[in-house]
Regions:
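Non-catalytic, topology-defining segments of multipass membrane proteins
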Residues: 1-200, 204, 244-302
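Active-site-proximal inter-transmembrane loops
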Residues: 147-154, 208-234, 239-241
Length: 302
């Protein structure tokens, strides 16, 4: 896994597969939701509920620490093995490959709530910002030019291409150990909840909450969303300084993902966790704006 590839030899554009990939994303997404009703026949056991709760929390950490804070923003460092394991864990949540995810998220930050933002509820409507953008054929290809720093690693390109391998492996493992109830209630239910939990940051966190910082978008801080996403709900903080590993800037802004990463750093599993500069915090903070009031963008933070 230590082998690196020259960025000039990145895979060719897969734009020609966009239409097919858009359909291939829509159908499984719908089927997973429908399959959740199979619990009528499999039953709902306490064991399956525990499995589902554990899978939700662990895979939410994979999404927040993996997809978002590491691959999209590189807010901390880890080893080659750690990078692969983070990618695998993130992809067990079935939100496509880490390179695809990171590329589109970087576009979001560059054009947040402006024309060209891939999932803004402000410019594209709530449904598009929440989930509809995933099914847009034009957004199906991986934007390789956005992730040249990550696409050097062949193991990440492999996982990005075969992005269903981690979630399918997990699903089969759950089925083998806990049976059909474990698969439906433990895996499928937690997967649907995980999806929509993550999606709320793209949608609700741009329309519902309080603004602590003047950012050039409509991002909000929302403690409820922070609770269900292990800390991602401090979204206005994040858009104020996206390079910070910790998104709960204040001591009372709980950020479970950061706490876990901090503990991992004690064992040298991750390192170089980043914090917002003190002068940035002092210079930009202002009284919070009331819930659901329109944001007034100011200067762009580069």
């Amino acid at each position: 896994m230590n082998q690196r590839t020259d960025p000039s030899t990145l895979p060719p554009s897969d734009t020609e597969l966009a239409k097919h990939n858009g359909l291939s994303a829509t159908l499984p997404f719908a089927l997973v939701h429908v399959a959740c009703f199979a619990a009528i026949w499999t039953g709902v056991t306490s064991e399956a509920l525990v499995v589902g709760a554990v899978l939700y929390v662990v895979r939410m950490f994979g999404a927040t620490a993996g997809y978002h804070r590491y691959f999209a923003h590189r807010t901390f460092e880890t080893s080659h093995v750690g990078r692969f394991l983070l990618a695998w864990l993130a992809q067990t949540g079935a939100q496509k490959g880490v390179l695809w995810w990171a590329a589109h998220h970087r576009i979001h930050h560059q054009r947040s709530d402006q024309p060209g933002d891939v999932h803004s509820p402000v410019t594209g409507g709530f449904w598009h910002g929440h989930v509809g953008w995933i099914f847009d054929p034009e957004l199906s290809p991986t934007r390789w030019s956005r992730v040249r720093d990550l696409a050097r690693f062949p193991e990440l390109r492999f996982l990005n291409r075969f992005w269903l391998l981690p979630p399918l492996s997990l699903a089969l493992t759950v089925l083998a150990i806990w049976g059909w109830s474990g698969l439906v209630v433990g895996f499928l239910w937690s997967t649907v909840l995980l999806w929509h939990g993550v999606f709320t940051i793209n949608s609700l966190a741009h329309v519902w909450g309080r603004r602590t910082f003047d950012t050039p978008d409509h991002s909000r801080n929302n403690p409820l969303l922070a609770l269900i996403t292990l800390g991602e709900g401090w979204h206005n903080n994040h858009h104020h300084y996206m390079l910070s590993t910790r998104q709960g800037f204040r001591w009372w802004q709980f950020d479970i993902t950061y706490y876990v990463l901090k503990v991992m750093s004690w064992f040298h599993l991750v390192w170089d966790l980043r914090a917002p500069p003190a002068e940035l915090m002092r210079a930009q903070v202002r009284p919070a704006v009331a819930v659901l009031t329109p944001a007034q963008p100011s200067a762009v933070l580069r």
